[in-house]
Amino acid sequence: MSSTDAAAARSRAPRILCAGIIVLDEVFRVEEFPKADGKVQANKFFVVNGGCAANAAVAIARLGGGAALAGPMGGPAGEDHNGDQVLRALARENVDCRFCQRVDGLATAKSAIFMNGRGDRTIVTYRDERIAATVPADADIIVAAADAVLADNRYPDFVAPICAAARRRGAPVVLDGDRPTVEDDPLFGLATHVIFSSECLRETTGIADLGDGLRRIARATAAFVAVSNGPDDILYLDGGMLRRLPVFAISAVDTLGAGDAFHGGFALALAEGKDEVEAMRFGSAVAGIKCSRLGGSAGAPNRREVEEFLAENGLPRAAQSNAALQT
């Protein structure tokens, strides 16, 4: 990124290009999950856009960032009703969807999500695997206006060229490690930051201890690496030292899309010039507020709500966040 481009970026809200999976979510809220062959009545039902990239884009837009989305979808318009519904919802959230690629004859992914009164989830997803072979039409054009890229690893053939194009421009690339993969995944080398879910890190490395898992991944990439772990502390490596960042204590109502909200907040904060610890703390606040509300990505907070939350609950605690873990 040239000095002129950098100066222009500072004069406006950062623009984050989110790349990856796009889903239509149908969510059923029940008191208890049905037993085998049983039936239950849902007490709430809603339809919302889903998928890591799409959820993160909504979070970024609500926080005041410029949010663009790139990902393969079914098509064409008028025939793929799942995709049509998702794009209408994203347009209402001010997400730029011009780089969403529709694949004729296929259906956009769809999930049925069952959530009980304790916030536990069961998810069933239909996704036509032929969509995974889609590659971006022109990765350089897609990232031309992006100050940062946030990619999930659900469609590696689609996101890898986008990540590579962003790196050529000098833009940060945040990889959401959501799908278990191999330890030497080429996407790790294309990212400046890799943040895993605990499940993904354990399944990718085969190592139960999250700290040891991060150390294993660090052998394959020079990227900043971290792992979120639900209500427990975020772990990350700092110069090879394993450290922790406490998360906010939240009474969770709905965790759907919380990780995506965290990644969106983290990527936006990085693009705004925050360091990794500050960005993780900001992302943690975004995710925490989202968890306190029912609605999936529709529960993502705005900037004022996050700033008020941080003011009430404290900014990053250097002594605590930079203390080495005893392992």
What is the meaning of each model-derived region?
Residues 160-244, 251:
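Conserved phosphate/ATP/ADP-binding segment of small-molecule kinases
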Residues 61, 167, 271:
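Gly/Ala-rich phosphate-binding loop of Rossmann-like dinucleotide-binding domains
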Residues 1-17, 210-327:
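Conserved phosphate-binding/catalytic region of the ribokinase-like
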Residues 130-139, 157, 175-183:
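Active-site glycine-rich loop that binds ribose-phosphate moieties when present
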Residues 69-72, 98-103, 113-148, 153:
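Conserved phosphate-binding/catalytic loop of the ribokinase/pfkB sugar-kinase fold
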Residues 1-76, 85-88, 322-327:
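Glycine-rich phosphate/adenosyl-contacting loop at the front of the ribokinase-like
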Residues 89-105:
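A glycine-rich helix N-cap at a beta->alpha junction
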